[in-house]
Every structure is written in C-alpha cells, then in structure tokens.
Amino acid sequence: MIENNKGLKFYDNLDLTHSHNDEDLQDVYKEWAAAYDHDNDNLLGTVSQPLSVQIFQEYIKDKSLRIIDVGCGTGLVGAELEKGGFSNFDGIDISQEMIDIAKQRGYSKLFIGSLNDSLPCENNEYDAAFCVGVFTHGHVGSERLDELVRIVKPGGIICFTINEGVYESYGFNSKIKKLESENVWK
C-alpha cells in the first residue's frame, strides 16, 4: 500500500532542490517512479498532461505527425496521445525507472536524456514537441526553450507548461517575449 502523503514528500524534495541538478532529480524520480501516477492522480492532480493533449488536438488533426515528449516521465502525455489516435511519438526522460513505466504507453521509441543538455535529436527532427511538467522548481530554466525550438521543424508546434512559481524567477516571461520578438515562434 502506498502512503497517502509520500507523493507530497517527493514533490517537496523537488521544490527544495532548486539546483537544476540532474543527479538529484534522478535520485528523486528513481524512488518515486512506482508511485508517481498514483500520487499525481490522487494527491497532486493530473491535469496538465490531458489538458495539453486536448488543446493540441483542437489545432492538430494530422495523427501521423512525428512528436517527441520531452520529460516524458511515466508516459502520461503518451497515454493521452495514444487515446487521441496519435501513433508516431517518442519520449525522452532523465529517469530510466520512469521510462520503464512509460514503455506501456504507446511510444515508438524511448531514450534517456536531459533538457539541461543537448538532446540526442537532430535539428528539425520532429513536427511537434510536448514538454509538460518539466519547467518547474529545480528542473529546467527558460534558456532551454531554445533546445525545443532546435528539434522541432519550422512551423511545428511546441506544447509546454510552466509552473507559475518559476514563470518570473526563472526568466520564462522575458525568454518567451524574446523568442516572439525574434520571430522564432508565435
């Protein structure tokens, strides 16, 4: 049986980490992987993954697009993409334990990598990218939006969430405005 408050302990550990240190994050997710989905559904509220895919589907009708889920974790976005009829999506995460769970969720390919580094992807390799739950406390800063732009084809879609607690302090507001003013995206 999973402790009712254990997920909050893991989440608090992430909030306190603030270091953008992948080794610290890997340690937390290694321990949390088995209970992650339960904790998101029952304690933290899984809303961003299904909502992100729902909004994506309102604009994208081509189910054959090549998609990458950056920071795929246990594959919550992948499960929603699969429900929506998409079948050509890959995932990348820093945690092998999370990827092991994601293997059951329709991904074409899963691999280890971190958005804090260059992703093992070609320039313009994907039609779309998801990055849900990654831009948050102690994970990844705003400068890494450039890496998502690099791997998505011109005219492609990048669907991401940002924790409101880091929107200003991690520089997302200014980075998004800069990318818009430079016509990198709209």
For the regions a language model picked out, list residue spans one by one.
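Conserved beta-strand signature within the Rossmann-like core of class I S-adenosyl-L-methionine
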Residues: 155-164
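Conserved SAM-binding loop and adjacent beta-strand
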Residues: 38-53
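A short acidic, Gly/Pro-enriched loop at the edge of an enzyme's catalytic core
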Residues: 119-129
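A short glycine-rich, Lys/Arg-flanked "PGG" loop and its adjoining helix->strand segment in the class I
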Residues: 142-154
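Class I SAM-dependent methyltransferase SAM/SAH-binding core
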Residues: 68-118
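A short beta-strand submotif of the Rossmann-like class I SAM-dependent methyltransferase core
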Residues: 131-134
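Conserved Class I S-adenosyl-L-methionine
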Residues: 170-186
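N-terminal auxiliary segments of SAM/dcSAM-dependent transferases
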Residues: 1-22
